[in-house]
Amino acid sequence: MNAHPPPQLRQLTRPDEVTPRLREELIDCWEAVVNSGGAVIAAEFPLPPVSRTDVAPVVDGLVRALDPGLGRMLVATVGGALAGWLVVRRDRHPLVAHRGAVNHVQTLPRLRGRGIATALMERATAVAREEMGLERLAIAVRGGAGLEEFYRRLGWTEVGRWPGALRVAPGDDRDEILMSLVL
């Protein structure tokens, strides 16, 4: 029996659905994840540690991009507070419009191990298939953090690897692992 209640999941499809409180929680979550060693570093961020000043404009950009057909945010809450989140998106171009990508998968460090990321990923898969009409999802994960095993358990397959593509710190290069899930 799980001692922790399951997270409540909610899907956001438009910028106006993100309240000021949720915006602050998204920023706090991402800052905490990155500064605890999490592998969710946006291209716009400096190397860790990051601050709210670094994170806020990236969150704002993700929120502005929310659109029912192109980009959705899934949030997980526990006890009414944000516990984790991710983004599912697709490209409009006809060559790739049948597939989407999952990005920014994260849970608050203090709430890890409670099935929050699993619940988010399972819901993302259903949303992508049933609501967005996608046929395949892609994700890129940092090697050396055990993430590829997490995704494998959820049915994802490694389809490529860029050796040493991610420099986490001087002398600490990690592979970027490309994974795919057929829906």
Model-derived features with residue positions:
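Short, low-complexity, intrinsically disordered N-terminal peptides in bacterial proteins
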Residues: 1-9
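Short hydrophobic/aromatic beta-strand or adjacent loop that forms the aromatic wall/cage
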Residues: 71, 174-178
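Glycine-rich acyl-CoA binding loop
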Residues: 113-121
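Conserved acetyl-CoA-binding loop of GNAT-fold acetyltransferases
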Residues: 152-162
